[in-house]
């Protein structure tokens, strides 16, 4: 989206960056969850990912921080009236994200940690759907009611 918008307009604006930054972070969080799940295998095969460099515990803390940053980013722009307040409904996705982080903190087997992948992907999807619902609600809500 950002590349297309930049190609068409020759500029990047906050209107495009406000939703794009959390999207990018959440997609990266899915990939980071995969790295955390495969930590032992990746380390044994000499892979040098951010998670390997930080360690399992550090990577898990960073993952939780990324989810929290996404919600804080959305809240900041909602409270500064850059996006409608109703998009804060997307914060519900944080609950699902933290379930995945808790599973990764347990450092059980990879089968158990597969659930963390599910929760990470689900929270990303939920965030985007609820953010979109919030935008649509703010646009059409007054017109329908």
State the predicted function of each range.
Residues 1-29, 53-57, 63-145:
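Hydrophobic alpha-helical transmembrane segments
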Residues 28-51:
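Acidic (Asp/Glu-rich) catalytic motifs at the cytosolic membrane interface
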Residues 41-45, 62, 131:
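Active-site-proximal flexible loops/turns
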